[in-house]
């Protein structure tokens, strides 16, 4: 852990998440676990992993004390092997193969009926484990090389994430940047390659649908 100052996009503020369950819960009861589906917390102290190291940021008056407390907790965590995440029972899907195909066929009927344009059909995978997700965070991020990632712990609830996509970034002078991947293609300096990529993106129905829905 190092105390360092970088020109970073995040200088403190809200950290949290919105889950799909939060949106769905406005219309149907989807609660199956005692865990939050939405959380926002305002933080002026945070850690960020960049350039191969962790950096500490804080606008608090007691920043030095907070830094020392976090350093102490991290040292204790490294010595405590009980926090290492271990699977006690393998991951298993909530649905059987037959149940998944039934849900898939129902989605097709919804689309044919015009009730929806696209549906992202997913299901829950469950496992029994001991330890904390934090012990696997760095390993996951190094494995995926995802440019956007985070870890959040709320009481007994943990959230570990990584993504290649940037949804929304608020910049200076009221600018908003987004970098989706679905329905997009890379740009090329060569005009012929750029034109070919544009044609490839414009023609397939799948890419057109994703572009209309997401981009």
What are these regions (language model features)?
Residues 1-215:
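Extended alpha-helical targeting/anchoring segments
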């Amino acid at each position: 852990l190092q105390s360092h100052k970088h020109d970073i996009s995040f200088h403190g503020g809200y950290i949290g998440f919105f889950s799909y369950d939060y949106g769905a819960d406005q219309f149907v009861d989807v609660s199956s676990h005692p865990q939050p589906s939405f959380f926002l917390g305002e933080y002026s102290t945070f850690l960020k992993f960049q350039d191969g190291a962790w950096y500490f940021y804080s606008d608090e008056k007691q920043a030095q004390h907070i830094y020392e407390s976090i350093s102490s907790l991290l040292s204790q965590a490294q010595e405590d092997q009980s926090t290492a995440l271990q699977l006690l029972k393998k991951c298993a899907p909530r649905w059987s193969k037959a149940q998944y195909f039934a849900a898939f066929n129902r989605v097709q009927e919804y689309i044919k009926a015009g009730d929806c344009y696209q549906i992202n059909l997913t299901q829950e995978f469950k496992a029994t484990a001991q330890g904390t997700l934090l012990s696997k965070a760095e390993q996951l991020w190094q494995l995926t090389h995802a440019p956007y990632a985070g870890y959040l712990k709320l009481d007994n609830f943990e959230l570990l994430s990584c993504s290649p996509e940037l949804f929304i970034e608020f910049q200076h002078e009221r600018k908003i940047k987004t970098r989706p991947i679905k329905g997009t293609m890379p740009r090329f300096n060569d005009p012929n390659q750029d034109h070919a990529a544009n044609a490839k993106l414009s023609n397939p129905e799948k890419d057109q649908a994703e572009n209309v829905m997401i981009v």
